[in-house]
Amino acid sequence: MEEILKEQNLELGGIQVHYKEAAPAGRQAGQGDALLILHGWGASSESWVLLQRQLCKEGYRVITIDLPGFGRSNSPATVWGVQDYSNFIEQFVQAIGIRQFFLLGHSFGGQIAISFTVQHQELVKKLILCAPAGIRRPPGAREKLLFVFSKILTLVFLAVPSQSLKNRFRAAAYRLMRRSDYFKAEGVMREVMRRVIREDLFSVFSQIRVPTLVVWGDDDRLVPVEDAYVLVREIPHSAVEIISGAGHVPHLKTPEKLSQLVTKFLKA
């Protein structure tokens, strides 16, 4: 089945938003079961084009969005949290005329998808969570040691006169803490990241009532695969699929396998 991929823009709450919509050829705009995909931190709709096309061939209207602050969408004017992004998604689906839809969220996008679904279960027909963030753990010994070391590096760079050397020390400190995304973020988005990584959604998992598929790569080094089993234990109508050989981005590493799992779940 051939598909048509369109890139579009709209303004919501003063923010210019970019999104992509793929629909099977010959189908009128707005027709067909819709699937909305929310990307992870530091990514954009572009990273989902391959999977978007594959799922479109299965007959779905697939929409990927550049969340505010990513890709070609403007950043929010204030420091947003997960709730703000969830509210934004509500405005977005209303603006493009989706009443009920399937929802897929990856990593940070999974955090948003969880928050949105809990509050709008009447809108979400089925939920796919791909290595979602949202579970906070107390730091272990390694993390505590790295935190202390990163603080030392930060103090060292303050005493260095060269700006280029300062940047190197700062980058090293954030990388040690696995916060290179924070280092790369600019302006308000740095504070957005600081806010969202502190948000723990564990207490709301059990409130999800829609059928849910949890997908994880067994080689995920960013969000531990053990979290998958926490989710399926807490979410009433959920199942888990672990993709062998995939890391944190199965939509890029193993797109065919992810497409098969998603399609099977949506058609069940």
Residue ranges of each PLM-predicted region?
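Gly/Ala-rich beta-loop-alpha elbow adjacent to hydrolase catalytic centers
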Residues: 105, 109, 113
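Catalytic histidine-centered segment of alpha/beta-hydrolase-like enzymes
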Residues: 246-255
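Conserved HGGG/HGGXW glycine-rich cap/lid loop of the alpha/beta-hydrolase fold
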Residues: 15, 22-25, 29-72
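Short beta-strand/loop motif that positions the catalytic acidic residue
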Residues: 208, 214-216, 220
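Conserved acidic catalytic loop of the alpha/beta-hydrolase fold
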Residues: 83-101
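Flexible "cap/lid" loop of the alpha/beta hydrolase fold
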Residues: 114-119, 124-157
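Conserved alpha/beta-hydrolase "acid-adjacent" motif
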Residues: 221-227
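Conserved alpha/beta-hydrolase catalytic His-Asp/Glu region
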Residues: 140, 155-209
